[in-house]
UniProtKB/Swiss-Prot annotation:
Record protein name field: Cytochrome c-type biogenesis protein CcmE
The encoding gene: ccmE
UniProt-annotated binding residues for heme: 120, 124
A GO-annotated cellular component: plasma membrane
Cytoplasmic topological domain: 1-8
Length: 128
């Protein structure tokens, strides 16, 4: 009887340790995806060249058209402002005061976005 209880206890301990190890590996690999985007106040110069997702509101009167498909604008989280350069087609919902998420890299103090995602509330209706 004693040997049977000891074997069960060892099996339970091994299963528990395996589960902890599996959860640790999953959380480590999902680390960069747990937080979908960073606000401008959390961006540091240390993250140069690293792929980032930055989110905030497009600041009023900050949208500057540089070329046909190249624009510059500022996003804010009401703590810090952050300049973004983007080349490409703008999302339909892009406008001043709108929440956006920019995906790209920090280069020389400016954020070069390769993709823009416009955020919307729960009342979104596609254009007709």
């Amino acid at each position: 009887m004693q040997k049977r209880v000891r074997n069960r206890l060892i099996t339970i301990i091994i299963c528990f340790c395996s589960a902890c190890l599996g959860i640790s590996i999953i959380l480590y690999n999902l680390e960069k995806n747990i937080v979908f985007f960073l606000p401008p106040s959390k961006i540091n110069e240390i993250e140069q060249g690293k792929e980032l997702r930055v989110g905030g509101l497009v600041k009023t009167d900050s949208i500057n058209k540089i070329a046909d498909d190249k624009i510059s604008f500022v996003i804010t989280d009401n703590i810090k402002d952050f300049e973004i350069l983007y080349q490409g087609t703008l999302p339909t919902l892009f406008r001043k005061g709108q929440g956006i998420i920019a995906i790209g890299q920090l280069s020389n103090g400016k954020f070069i976005a390769r993709q823009l995602l416009a955020k919307h509330d729960e009342n979104y209706r596609p254009p007709q």
